[in-house]
C-alpha cells in the first residue's frame, strides 16, 4: 500500500512538473529553451514510466516525440540523444539507439554515450549475430573499443571499468573460451570497478 501511495504521489508530482515545463515549450521561448524543456519532459516520463503499463506506453510515445523534437531543435543536447537512445533500445530498436549514441560521440568524446555504446554492441552481438561468427566478434570488439574510450575519459569511473570487464568477458566467450588472458583482463577491470580505478 505504501509503495502504491508513493507511486501515486510521484505521478502527481510528475504531472505538476510536466505542466510547468510546458510553459517553457512555447513559441515565445528560444529554440534552446524549448529543446531543454522537451528533453526534460521526455526524460522524466522515460524515467518514471512502467514500460509494461498500457497508459504509460502512450506516455512513452509522447516522451519519444519530445526527445526527437529536443534533438532536432538543439542537435548538441547530448542528454536528449542519450535518453532517446535508451528509450529506442528498450523498444528493441537497436539501430536507432546506436544512431543516437553515435550522434553524440561524433561531435565529441562522451563517457555516458561510450558506456551505452559498449553495452549496446554486446546486445547487438547477441541479438543479431550467430555465436562464434566474425560478425559477432566484430560487434564485441566495438563494445570493447567504446568501453576503453569511456575509461580513457575518466579513470575513476567504476561503471566504465565494469563495462570494460563485461566486454572482455564477452570477448572471451565469443572467441571460444580459449584465451585465459581475456578472462584475467576482465577480472582486473571488475577489480578496478570496485576500487574506482586502477
What are these regions (language model features)?
Residues 14-34, 52-53, 68-76, 103-113, ...:
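Flexible helix-coil transition and linker loops at the boundaries of alpha-helical arrays
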